[in-house]
């Protein structure tokens, strides 16, 4: 049964899927140019910056055109227009404007042409602070910037908050195969590439091709023996305490090496059973942003999984732009969660004891 049947957020879901699909087209065009030109940094003039802004503008446009207007439009997103309004930013603003307009024309759905001022205004649609009341869209226009630059995994991640709760999430993963991932950077041999994950509260989770295909219901794996489990973590070592995640895996009895991929594509892969566990333990002092987890977490929970902080608390997306949580984020199926939580807490305790002076 499709999520549209009996889904109170069916119209919002359709708009969200359309929004991230259009944004993905823009991102794919830019990534192709990056790989051909050899760009490898997120400098202010770099193509990835253009793609970040362009993706956000297109998502905002489609949502405002397609999603039911319950009240004033509100979106919590990563980018604002401050840098683009500064002296010296004219060239990058010109590039963004040109790319967005080209994408809209190529798509053919909307007869809209953005001026530069219209571009700046559309970017600032994402300046909402979110919070516990009302409806707020939550967007990461390119999650996994370094993966995007390398030609690896990235995601356009969009969720809807309703009264502080995530009720809908979509993940466009242009480089993720539709088949189960088979190596350590999320690639797969021979499978069609470009996955679109979606979930609505109470209606389950699905995956379909970004190019358009019937949606298929997905569910997390049913593994209950940690020895048979594999775990996902960030590709970038700077994003993760690998000594800690390695200790957790060892205490749990996991024998497979970690599968390291960028972005919330990890949540999508976990939700369809490609692996059993996701561990995210950033370095001390890092504050998690809600757009880094809102869409991915509901895809996993609607696929039958659990997503919590290191103490087993549900993630609270109602506190504004940041998550207020304990230490890290873990996700797995219901069978493995009790033993995973114990391994996490034992490993953290051991690490803290080793770090404290005698």
From Swiss-Prot:
Cofactor(s) listed in the protein's UniProt record: Mg(2+)
Record GO terms (molecular function): 3'(2'),5'-bisphosphate nucleotidase activity; metal ion binding
Tissues with expression: Is constitutively transcribed in both roots and shoots.
pH sensitivity of activity: Optimum pH is 8.5.
One GO BP: phosphatidylinositol phosphate biosynthetic process
UniProt-annotated binding residues for AMP: 239, 263, 266, 280, 292
Record-linked CDD domains: PAP_phosphatase
PROSITE patterns: IMP_1, IMP_2
Assigned EC number: 3.1.3.7
Effect of mutating residue 140 to A/N: Has less than 5% wild-type catalytic activity
Binding site for adenosine 3',5'-bisphosphate: 145, 239, 263, 266, 280, 292
Binding site for Mg(2+) 2: 140, 143, 292
Record text on activity regulation: Inhibited by Ca(2+), Li(+), and Na(+) and activated by K(+).
Catalysis performed (reactions): 3'-phosphoadenylyl sulfate + H2O = adenosine 5'-phosphosulfate + phosphate; adenosine 3',5'-bisphosphate + H2O = AMP + phosphate; adenosine 2',5'-bisphosphate + H2O = AMP + phosphate
Database matches in InterPro entries: DPNP, Inositol_monoP_metal-BS, Inositol_monoP_superfamily, Inositol_monophosphatase-like, Inositol_monophosphatase_CS
Active site: 52, 145
Annotated binding of Mg(2+) 3, by residue: 78
Cysteines paired by S-S bonds: none
Residues the entry annotates as binding Mg(2+) 1: 78, 140, 142
Entry keywords, A to Z: Hydrolase, Magnesium, Metal-binding
Leader sequence segment: none
Protein family membership: Belongs to the inositol monophosphatase superfamily.
Known role: Phosphatase that converts adenosine 3'-phosphate 5'-phosphosulfate (PAPS) to adenosine 5'-phosphosulfate (APS) and 3'(2')-phosphoadenosine 5'-phosphate (PAP) to AMP. May regulate the flux of sulfur in the sulfur-activation pathway by converting PAPS to APS. Shows no activity on myo-inositol 1-phosphate, beta-glycerol phosphate, NADPH, NADP and 5'-AMP.
Official protein name in the record: 3'(2'),5'-bisphosphate nucleotidase
Organism: Oryza sativa
